[in-house]
Amino acid sequence: MLNVQLKGKRTWMQSLLLVMFLLSSTLAFAQNKVTGTVTDKTGAPLPGVNVLEKGTTNGSITDVDGKYSINVEKGKTLMFSYIGFTTREIVVNQNVINVALQEDLQALDEVVVIGYGSMTRKDVTSSITTVKADKLNVGTYTSPAQLLQGKVPGLTITQSSDPNSEYSSITLRGASSLRGGEAMEPYYVVDGVPGVSLALVAPEDIESIDVLRDATATAIYGSKAANGVIIVTTKKGKAGKATVTYSAYIAADKVMKNLDMMTADDLRAYAKANNFTINNDFGANTDWQKEVQRTAFTHNHNVSISGGSDRTSYTASINYMEKQGVIKGTDMDRLIGRAFVQTRALNDRLILSMNLNASITNNNSVETGGDNNSVYDAMNYYSPLVPVRDENGNWTNYVGVSQNYNPLSMINEDLYHHQTKKMQGTAKASLDIIDGLQWNATLSYQNEQFLWDEYHTSQSQMTYVKDNGQAHRRTTQDLKKVFETYLNYDKTFNEVHKLGIMLGYSWEETTKADGYGLTVYDFYNDD
């Protein structure tokens, strides 16, 4: 009986091995090894070409001699892709497939902005990333910088701790972590004018954004561009009848999940289960997160008009945004105006243009200071046993119950307002002197005014505030003047040799933090 069982088991195992061998043989015969060489139209090998079986992750890459090898079934499709060349798809019907890729003329002839002028992408040897308007992020963004999030390799954007702020910290890969603030920031250029604030540009007015890195940025703009350059090109008017465009959106923000905190009833049940008495239980069951937060709404409107003739074109736009914060007492509103006009003369050899940008931003915020006077901390740590107001209608302030101030008191009695006014005007001239030789001149003036208002009412719980209220106002003004003139010579000889020379002069004067500050207190009333 035992011998019969062993013999049957051996026969079953032999059959299983035979089936596995046949299956592996079938797969081996189904998978063809395809080899070949990928070249350009002149026959030069192309290293680094991606060879991929369409619809799968099965792929390979060409070596320094343009050769590749890949296992793929007959009848499947191979895709050959390489930067600057059009992608080819070939159905596998033989074991050797040699491919000649054609240059993507559209991609190579794409014009990119490099600072003092522009070049076709095929002539650029440095790292430049271009993001067109239709590829920018879509959403309720307060800063144009946020439109680039996730679009540029190595670009990190950190939003201000105030969610309604128009300021975002930007760093490009390679910037030193030992520095902070403006020392980490890239250099901004708007419509060819260096050092222009991004707050003067409405996201809807952006045509494209070019990001320059490595030696190109420093060679053009010097050490101030050591962290890279972000070049913003705005939309311009075109010849034709006037066109009016209106766009708008409405959005809502809400905190999806808060920290899980003990309610007052949870705390009382815990005390009862563990046989201890809670001191300072005022019978309330306050959800401070719910009291402090809200559903916030944002609405944005943009109106633009553009048009022109064969000689003259113009563009004007107005953008208005109003954004609430999810924390009560926080909000911002912003108004941006822009006007541009350009005209041609001397048989189109002379181009004159003027540009004017202005913005006003108001930002209301709440106390986010130290451990005891932060609304964000207090809404999580203030005792749920305490009501919002006492029996007399005053904000509760029970020393010993919580080390924080009443968060609703800080929102309503400690007020912070920040206003920014910015204006920038530019005049440009460009003259084609002879074939290939062009003269350019730019004059720019930028004025930025900052106002900080801080008012603590007589009902403020802050210990440093005087009995009858305290107010602080600070204002500063920054001025920037820029004049640049340069000659560009760009000539191609015999359709093969290309010569480019740039000679220029740049002057810049900046005055920062010119202002005053004042603190007053002991008011008659809070009006």
Regions found by a protein language model. Give the residues of each.
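Short, small/polar-rich motifs associated with maturation and membrane association
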Residues: 1-339, 344-345, 350-353, 357-359, ...
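Surface-exposed loop/interface segments of Gram-negative outer-membrane beta-barrel transport/assembly proteins
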Residues: 238-285, 326-327, 336-422, 440-527
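Active-site and adjacent substrate-binding regions of carbohydrate-active enzymes
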Residues: 436
